[in-house]
């Protein structure tokens, strides 16, 4: 085996960053541990996905105390925090207690022609000089750091929110989660307000504006508050669930408060703005919220086929034009035909009788279709004429009475 690179971590710096790690460790189980800037000052980062449109990065600037790398290796090296088929978590062991030394070594097989590492070994030595932990896993493919992409973008505005404002904003966002899956963030330079819109609901947050460069403003804070540096008006559409999680991740009591950075291209970064009383300034947490404006177009496209389906011409005509009197008059005619068929049909009738009944049933319909105008000029039937349709019901009622009387007589 040939060693390609080795990194020795500082247990003291990791111990001082334990409070931030405990705050975000639930989001880092399926993360990637990455070592970047190998030619200058190596930086250790723990990167993980957050929901469907967010990325969490827990970065430690001075975590690497010593390094040895080959000149051919210039790209970042990364491996999984949680190895396949096991319960070992590298980050949990790195931020443990009573640790004396941590060594991360990348190596490869001597038979392979490639100079890139294939495996990684973590070796942790504890203070008792007896206990030692070793774990070996494979190296994942190259993953470009998020910072390199953000460095190419232009920072339009940076906004700091106090812990009280963040708590109220989180509560308001949770109450309106069912209104829309996305949230629209808009900063107005003239009015110095942040407008958050979810569906038909919106809330406004006022802040104090400073004439500063947003990229380098508010690195450390004496006291948290609502203030910012804005160059131009900016708008971004982000995932609502990711926004709620991002505010909670970057809000660590007595350590840091959320800072909103608006980049060109509709990207919003919620990072941790450290307070001066913080004891871990080298550890930073940031969440990148990707542009979610396309998610608004997809539901609209799915609803178009259902709303734009052409209706039947008959139904459209019935809605546009008033219904003629023909259906209202034809109802009693159709009621008279079925009783005749019922009376004539019996188990003793022959096939010829049934044919005659079928022909008689069709006669009212044909005569009605040929002369529909005979029924239109007639006024509503008086009560005397209405009784003409009731003789058929009389024998039914008499039969019921006779049956009931006979039944009583038998008893």
Curated annotation (Swiss-Prot):
Pfam families (UniProt xref):
Herpes_DNAp_acc
InterPro entries to which the protein is assigned, alphabetical? DNA_pol_proc_fac_herpes
Classify the source by domain of life: Viruses
Gene Ontology BP terms: DNA replication
Location of region: Disordered: 296-411
Q: Which Gene3D superfamilies match?
A: 3.70.10.10
Give start-end positions of Acidic residues composition bias: 345-358
Compositional bias of type Low complexity: which residue ranges? 304-318
Keywords, A to Z?
A: DNA replication
Q: Which family does it belong to?
A: Belongs to the herpesviridae DNA polymerase accessory subunit family.
Biological function:
Increases the processivity of the viral polymerase, probably by acting as a sliding clamp that prevents dissociation of the polymerase from the active template.
This chain belongs to the protein called DNA polymerase processivity factor
Q: Which organism is it from?
A: Alcelaphine herpesvirus 1 (strain C500) (AlHV-1)
Name the gene that codes for it.
59
